[in-house]
Amino acid sequence: MAKKQDCNLSCSECSVRNCYRKDKTFPAFCLTEQYPDALERTRKFYASNTTDGKLARAAAEIEGEYYGRLTRLEESIRFAKKLGVKKLGIASCIGLLDEASLYAKIVRTAGIETKTVICKVGAVDKTQLGIPDGLKVCPGCNEACCNPALQAQILNEWGSELNVLVGLCVGHDAIFTRHSKAPATTFIVKDRVLGHNPAAALYTAKFYYKRILDEKTFPEPRKEAVEAELAAAKPAKTTAKKPAAAKPTKKPAVKKVAK
């Protein structure tokens, strides 16, 4: 095994890719040769009857059976059936509810029960999280925050055996997977600009979309949003009230006694 290299080189800098076919030589910084203990641990639990082992084998079997022949939609259903899933949870963005509804219908056609929970469940206004009203997409309106933790907890209580994410926001998907008791996989990745195809930014990064390679050309946030953030960060001004002047006490009138 190679010794761990004191550098930041990793798989993204490798052009050998010997880990796939093992018909070449591993580079000096190869992670495969630098973590023997972790490698042995993962190899053991993939071969075991644990949840990770079942997931790994099901995914590998589907790859071998249908490589290049199934859409991701079809593959997710084959994956669920191979695992013996009876109850499949769907955590959807409200903006992709039509797509989630059609996906649920197709899954049910395959004989699997579904339950869909949209991101705005709970209807908690963003201001209740401490978000300034000016940072809403529509300031002045009731604007519910996404609630991925509640989505996960509802599906947990329902007893889902596999959860599928449909267009959850960046970050909200991370919260959902942290709270989901069942394994979670993704069907649609949200990209509001590129029609939910985030890889398109990489396909055009060297020419049409080259701004992503230069931090200086990154779009500025909305002016109204910045102003709202600044206003929220300023401490509230308090004007000290002057103490009220003490009222003069009247001396009691002295009655004159007649001599």
Identify the function of each model-found stretch.
Residues A2-K87, I94-E99:
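Electropositive, gly/pro-rich neighborhoods at or near active sites that engage anionic ligands
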Residues G84-S92, T116-K120, L162-V166:
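Short glycine-rich or small-residue beta-strand-to-loop segments that form or flank ligand, phosphate
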Residues E99-I106, D173-A182:
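Short Gly/Thr/Asp-enriched flexible loops that form oxyanion-binding sites at enzyme active sites
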Residues K181-D214:
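Short, flexible loop segments at boundaries between secondary-structure elements
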